[in-house]
Regions:
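Pre-P-loop entry segment of helicase/translocase ATPase cores
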Residues: 331-363
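Homeobox/homeodomain signature
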Residues: 66, 252, 347, 357-359, ...
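Extended, folded cores of ATP/NTP-driven motor/assembly subunits in large transport
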Residues: 1-343
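Glycine-rich phosphate-binding loop of nucleotide-binding enzymes
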Residues: 1, 5-13, 352-395
Length: 395
């Protein structure tokens, strides 16, 4: 766990002030029938249909314990400013290679998305109720349409201050106020584990190291100046000059600790915007979903605050295009930013001729695997004596 955290810190430190990074976590609902189809065992003309029925019912009960009805996807989008498209492409290609190599060090499999895949992902965000995505780039020239025409929902409505409507869905965008002195690494995973369609986006922008150190030094100078003024006031009033406001003493020590982190502990300063999008069929269901997410934030001494009259900007900032339209940012060091570790649970749910191996201990989702698809299909059964290893192998 410590190694993952340290590697994730190094991953974030790679991005300099010229690169904007967006981490997107999208939980989208699928048709429940698709998951049930994966565990369905059809009847055959023999004497074992009763056993098949019993096993199929057991699999459906196990399926109901988890949230296999949700497809969880993670995306990273990085954006730069350049003088020309050619210069941007060459630099983005170098950044992409470095990002993929850094992911390999983390043990994370990642790949670049094609234009079609990006459009399909955007279509899924704008059509949360589902729907088939039909598109081909060869259709654009004859039809005179643009790619936006193929991904846009039937309607948008942003007239209400605290809600927005998109097609048949009603949604709300909130931002996380990070108030806690110490953050728990489970806050992001707990929000993503909600059995609702939720979209979480982290906009991360690095501050130039020299500029960050200069800014903190200026703050320390300002605090020292205020401290001197308080001491002068104490001398004039005739009481001990060491008695200064507690907030001033606290801010001074925290600023000096922050400066030490930046100068000697391989830390950088980042500006973070944490956005949460909830969507539901009814306003009551939406409020319940937002309340559940706000409860997780409150448990971690943070606050989930609605973006009043900024719903459109919030939704557009929650689309993985690398643009942040919400000017609400929180300054954090590398280690504080890295506490939002997105790699918590590894899921395995294959369809086809997959076998059932049990439930994921963290998420309660089913583990279905078809080992015949792997380069090395061998398996290893571990367990305490008498736990049923031989029986499991014979079964």
């Amino acid at each position: 766990k410590t190694a993952i955290f340290e590697n994730w810190c190094d991953f974030l430190n790679y991005f300099d002030a010229s690169v904007s990074v967006q981490l997107s976590f999208i939980n989208q609902g699928t048709q429940r029938g698709e998951a049930e189809k994966a565990v369905n065992i059809p009847a055959q003309e023999d004497a074992f249909n009763s056993i098949r029925t019993e096993y199929r019912d057991m699999l459906k009960n196990q399926l109901a314990k988890g949230n296999n009805g949700l497809v969880k996807a993670k995306y990273i989008t990085f954006a730069i400013e350049a003088d020309s498209l050619g210069a941007a492409k060459s630099r983005l290609a170098r950044i992409e290679t470095d990002v993929l190599n850094n992911f390999k060090l983390l043990g994370v499999s990642a790949r670049p998305m094609t234009g079609y895949e990006r459009l399909k992902m955007l279509h899924g965000i704008f059509h949360p109720e589902g729907g088939q995505f039909a598109f081909d780039f060869s259709w654009l020239a004859p039809s005179g349409l643009s790619t936006k025409d193929f991904i846009a929902p039937s309607s948008f409505r942003f007239g209400e201050g605290r809600y927005f409507r998109m097609g048949r869905k009603i949604g709300a965008v909130s931002f996380l106020e990070i108030l806690a002195p110490e953050l728990n690494d489970r806050i992001l995973s707990d929000i993503l584990d909600l059995e609702t369609g939720v979209i979480v986006n982290l906009h991360i922008h690095s501050i130039d190291q020299t500029e960050a150190i200069k800014t903190i030094k200026r703050k320390i100078t300002d605090l020292d100046k205020m401290k001197i003024e308080e001491q002068k006031k104490a001398v004039r009033s005739g009481y001990d000059m060491d008695i200064i406001p507690s907030d001033l003493a606290t801010f001074g020590s925290e600023a000096k600790n922050l400066l030490q982190d930046l100068q000697s502990r391989n830390e950088r300063m980042f500006l973070l915007t944490f956005l949460v999008v909830n969507m539901a069929d009814t306003k009551r269901k939406l409020e319940n979903d937002v309340f559940a997410a706000a409860g997780i934030a409150q448990k971690n001494n943070c606050a989930l605050t609605r973006l009043d009259y900024q719903q459109e900007a919030g939704l557009m900032s929650s689309v993985p295009l690398g643009e942040n339209l919400i000017p609400i940012q929180r300054g954090l060091t590398t280690s504080s930013t890295a506490i939002f570790i997105p790699f918590i649970t590894q899921e395995l749910f294959q369809t086809g001729a997959a076998l059932y191996y049990g439930l994921n201990a963290l998420s309660n989702n089913m583990i279905l695997c078809d080992r015949k698809q792997l380069k090395n299909p061998n398996g290893l059964i571990l367990g305490t004596p008498g736990s049923g290893k031989s029986f499991a192998a014979k079964r």
